[in-house]
Amino acid sequence: MKAIVLTGYGDVDRLEMREVPEPRAAAGELKVRVSASSVNAVDWKIRRGDMKAWMPVEFPHILGRDTSGEVVEVGLQGTGFKVGDRVLGLVRQAYAEYVTAPLDAWALLPPKLDLKDAAALPVVALTGAQLIEEAVRPRRNDLLLVTGALGSVARSAVHAATKLGARVIAGVRKGQVPEAAKLGVESVVALDDPAMVDRIPLLDSIADTVGGETVARLLPRVRRGGTIGSVLGEPSGAKERGLVVRAIQTHADSKRLAALAQAVVAGELVIPIGGRFPLPNAREAHRLAERGGTGKVLLTA
């Protein structure tokens, strides 16, 4: 089969289309013909070598955690799925024509969800939901600020927090305030406006998707004993202020992924698409994703 292979750390020219062995579904796995995968920040950070100190890879290496497609093989002991099912999943080595992964990595695709666009969901939707439900753990009426609120992970976090009855403040940049107001949150604050930050009421918690100085400036706005949930590790100075810090690593969750897909169909959760590229054009896709923005970049079959 064809796959996009990372041949070493570096720029996008280290991504090459190659013939690689086609996988077979082991016991308890599905094999899926990939309709689309997506480019996440972790992909281009791995490619550049930003993460090699704690997430080294062996070359050649196939990137990609998101995928959607059609089941072509069900391994032994594989229940709940059949050949021909349309699925989306949190996998590994998704920049390829076929991919295999355990059953709990997959969810059936709702009929009204576009098969290719579904590849935008698994990593960001699960990360946002797990950030709220497993790290922040807000109670009803807690006042929670989500940083980087127009990002895909943060959009999912806003959705999850709202479902739990939290009062959500969307934290964005000045120029993003009008767009963030459409998220259905209690209020919006420009985190690059010191005057607005100073007016933030006392928070019960922060769901941080940005890190760095942005979250550091917000720590004084959180009540003692409040919670910082993060996808980027522990913010400096948080525990010294008497705050509870919980970081998460995204993990497969079939039931939660299925529910998030239904939320997209219902219009409750919107993950924008920022670009679509054929799989052979992975270099261009990485360039666009690396420039940033608020939309997911897809690689399509």
Segments and roles (model prediction):
Residues D11-R14, V20-S68:
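N-terminal glycine-rich beta->alpha transition that marks the start or flank
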Residues S68-V91:
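A glycine-/small-residue-rich N-terminal strand-loop-strand element
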